[in-house]
Amino acid sequence: MFRNYNWFDAKEPISYESEIYAKGLKFQRPQITVDGRHWEQLAVERMTKDAAGYVYGCAGKRETYDKNMESFKKWSIIPNRLIKSGFPDLSTTVFGQKYPFPIALAPVGVQKIFNPEGESGSCAAATREHIPYIISTASATSFEDIEKASGPGERWYQLYWPSNDHQDITISLLNRAKKTGCRVLIVTLDTFILGWRPSDMDNGYDPFLNPDSIGVEHGFSDPVFRKQFKEKHGVEVEENMLEAAKEFAGIVFPGISHDWEDLKFLRKHWDGPIVLKGIMNVPDAKKAVEYGMQGIVVSNHGGRQQDGGVASLTMLPKIVDAVGDKLDVLFDSGVRSGADIAKALALGAKMVLIGRPYVYGLALEGSSGVSHVIRCLLGDLELTLHLSGIVSVKPKDLNRDVLYKEE
């Protein structure tokens, strides 16, 4: 399954703390703070204005984003005492596969605007730290180059779903994802058109429309798109990159949503697990079950798409209660610490996707910065659980009984 990769040959996350203190005895300090509250500010100061606006920016007046962040404070972990056990078991099982840790790197596009290493650096870090890496349709790096950088690591593919007029492009993207080792298909439902993003608009910056391959590399490297572009324009993609970028962006952000019946097309062309990302209410979650999906991600895209929305964490327990025994529920939006991860797992998520934090690590120190963020989050999670007397992330040990809802 994992291409001769010893998936469980991973360091105990808590060991990162010991490593840092040992280096401190030699007067060596971490290149990046271990305090996740400061990653964003440090990274934004390092980035260009356009890059900072893109990753930090949100829809509208940031209300959805703010609700995501505040929602975690509404739940508090209740510790248990005199629980004699080893370090907590952080392993989880999703889509029939056991993983050593309950996190994955969320799909984030255009990563070369944050650091020249781009997606290659991030996926290599995910492999080193034994967690799945989710390839974005908006990657600045091709499937094939990501496969080389990731090596034996676990990869999933996130699809920005072209309209039915471009099913041949969809099939080509899915085939390339399968050929390069992607096991799970994540279908993003909330981004058939980009949201109202003031920071990007104030900068006049849309990374998908620039005359380069950033954000549209999957298109520029796709044989079907390249063939169609040459037939239409009489030139190769490289000879008119501005038009090529505009056309591929229009294909993957078609401006209108698919409907539920269209999922049958994806099932026909993908033989692995299919997961719907962006499910935010119970009726839609039940529909996902009805249409035979293997999982959902409770997510509002980190507040980047729709303003005035409900926090993802607010909806998580309701959705888990409705469908958690019928498919795997994953979660993202607003996660910044080990305690945040613990709370999402306690509310029923089987795995938590990490987005902006690892991008900040990438901006600050490239691939090693991404590893640093992953190790900090997992170390923080393990200590949070251990000090709370919670022996594993399995539902029998980590559930709503360990949480108190603040008034």
Swiss-Prot record:
Residues 28-406 form the FMN hydroxy acid dehydrogenase domain. GO terms for molecular function: FMN binding; lactate 2-monooxygenase activity. Pfam families: FMN_dh. Its EC number is 1.13.12.-. A 2-oxocarboxylate binds at Y54, Y160, R197, R304. One of its GO terms (cellular component) is cytoplasm. Keywords: Cytoplasm, Flavoprotein, FMN, Monooxygenase, Nucleus, Oxidoreductase. It is found in: Cytoplasm; Nucleus. FMN binds at S136, Q158, T188, K277, D332, S333, G334, V335, R336, G355, R356. Its cofactor is FMN. Belongs to the FMN-dependent alpha-hydroxy acid dehydrogenase family. This is FMN-dependent alpha-hydroxy acid dehydrogenase PB1A11.03.
